[in-house]
Amino acid sequence: MGAVPHQITDHDRPADDTRRRLLTGVGVTERRLELAAIPTAVLEGGHGPPLVLLHSSGEFAALWQRVVPDLAATHTVVAPDLPGHGASAAPPGPLGADGMLAWLGELLEQTCPEPPVLVGRGLGGAVAARFAAGHGDRVLGLVLVGAFGLAPFDPAPAFGQAMQRFAEEPTADTRDGLFRQCFVDLDGLAGQLGERWAAVADYALDRARTPAMGAALEGLVPELVLPAIPPAELDRITVPTSLIWGLQDLQVRLAVAEAASARHGWPLQVIDRAGDDPPMEQPAAFLAALRAALAGTR
């Protein structure tokens, strides 16, 4: 338990350089914790009530970079790389839903002196929802952003094809093909971010080629990406819960969020000109939506 050293290999060094480019100016510190026997990279910044940001599958915590500085002005932000993602190690064995919930529980034990609000995108949303359903006393609130688990995984056909091509052969071309399904205006986003976007793209491709990510997703996809969380389990979520969705999300389409909102009474805020990553694509609108959701947890 606690902080652990990170073994740097020759293969890691180019990725570490790219990671430094990603995090420059974001205003976070990085430390390594051992969580459920998994060495985990955790970004932290700010002061105030704890806010835990959980990214999606095939991603990394630095993708929250456009909203972390604003959130850190009022909250203690905790953004881990999920197991096998980013700079976090692969799990020592098959990692399914139970293992992820144990991992998240240890993250909260080591980083949050009081119950946090969990904000989860995609896979991170499915993990956060299941944790809130089973451990409501350890969570102040829940915000689901394009989350998996509210219905069986059924992306738009073009999205699914691009995702499959990238998974089978991660190259710059297949990466950009997938990114064009993820974002409404990829060229505009790249232009806004400049060199920082180059670091995002380089790091995403490098991490997709690592055995660690494949090992993690092998267990996570069947249990936390593809299936719907049973409605009775979602009914056990008692903490204030909100939904934030991109209007043009092709991965988990808006109808999924609308159905969950109607069934559970969860407020839904929709962000225009955003696909499955509103905090990256429309940070100002996402921050406004998130602050409205956070106000409901007080």
Over which residues does each language-model region extend?
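Alpha/beta-hydrolase fold catalytic core
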Residues: M1-L51, T74-H75, C112-P115, L140, ...
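Conserved HGGG/HGGXW glycine-rich cap/lid loop of the alpha/beta-hydrolase fold
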Residues: I38-A87
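Active-site loop/oxyanion-hole signature of alpha/beta-hydrolase fold enzymes
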Residues: L43, V78-V119, L123, A288
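Flexible "cap/lid" loop of the alpha/beta hydrolase fold
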Residues: A133, L140-A172
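Conserved alpha/beta-hydrolase catalytic His-Asp/Glu region
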Residues: F153-A158, A172-R236
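Conserved loop-alpha-helix segment in the C-terminal half of the alpha/beta-hydrolase fold
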Residues: R236, P240-A274, M280
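Post-His helix in hydrolase/transferase enzymes
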Residues: M280-A292
